[in-house]
Amino acid sequence: MTNIRKTHPLMKIINDAFIDLPTPSNISSWWNFGSLLGLCLIMQILTGLFLAMHYTPDTTTAFSSITHICRDVNYGWIIRYLHANGASMFFICLYAHMGRGLYYGSYAFQETWNIGVILLFTVMATAFVGYVLPWGQMSFWGATVITNLLSAIPYIGNTLVEWIWGGFSVDKATLTRFFAFHFILPFIILALAIVHLLFLHETGSNNPTGIPSNMDKIPFHPYYTIKDILGALLLILTLLMLTLFAPDLLGDPDNYTPANPLSTPAHIKPEWYFLFAYAILRSIPNKLGGVLALLLSILILAFIPMLHTSKQRSMMFRPFSQFLFWVLVADLLTLTWIGGQPVEHPYMIVGQFASILYFLLILVLMPTASLIENKLMKW
């Protein structure tokens, strides 16, 4: 008799995706982040669901409802902080996952990569609208500043901003719709993640060498299920350490002050995971130019498959490209640091240099290094 997991219509899908899936035998721990992102998403949906049961999306009671969750609801404080710090863990895994894709040339699977870029935009949108919900000072002013960027769009800008606000400023209507968006978007992310996986399983996984591994595959279970469980345990441990010992480490103290439209915080800044893009936005003195640079800093990822000039897929055997990749990582860390600093000398000039270097690396230096490496292969 054939095993039920191979015959049952539903079990067959699970079997082909997580049990009998032929997987390259040499994929490293950098391939763990996909499953960790799935885990993060499930955790965020579950903690978010329980938070939504006690939260009120109204300007007069939103801040108080968060206080109520933390003080009066059974284990409400841990649910709230797991959700807030879970977002940080989500982005750590997301950036590691993208870095892996860049380094090992996983972007050659174009459909998978493009869905990934769409997923990144969706996750960023979800995190942004979610940050507005506690209705603290940084929530309010963050929402005001970021939505206001759309007014840079010629002709329709101002109308568009007021349409998104649902009025003439960030107010009750804005908060209510942002709550609705924050509730629906994770389910859209879940659907997109399934499509992402569907496209990946059409081609099979890449591996560190970038060479086809069809002749050397092993079943996903038990080899990679156990490896994923180890990754999951490390993720949960890190999240619990952060949540239980330093829950406010990554948050902004200003968000413990209720939103006040009459008083602007000294330094308006987003959460750490958006700081690199915020630094690029601020480094351009022109409003429309800044908005375009901000959009392009993420959208540039969609053009990476077209910028691949190397004859090799992975960077494993390409020292020049490896060096430039780590320069890019250092540059992004620099931008993240600059984004959290006030707009004054010397931070401004450092931010401008780092922003130019970011685009220069991706558009010019890395493709050029690949061409040089192609020439060196003929020696």
Swiss-Prot record:
Cofactor note: Binds 2 heme b groups non-covalently.
Parts forming coiled coils: none
Keyword flag Ion transport: no
Biological process annotations from GO: mitochondrial electron transport, ubiquinol to cytochrome c
Pfam family, one: Cytochrome_B
Binding site for heme b b562: H83, H182
PANTHER family: CYTOCHROME B (PTHR19271:SF16)
Subunit field text: The cytochrome bc1 complex contains 11 subunits: 3 respiratory subunits (MT-CYB, CYC1 and UQCRFS1), 2 core proteins (UQCRC1 and UQCRC2) and 6 low-molecular weight proteins (UQCRH/QCR6, UQCRB/QCR7, UQCRQ/QCR8, UQCR10/QCR9, UQCR11/QCR10 and a cleavage product of UQCRFS1). This cytochrome bc1 complex then forms a dimer.
This protein's name: Cytochrome b
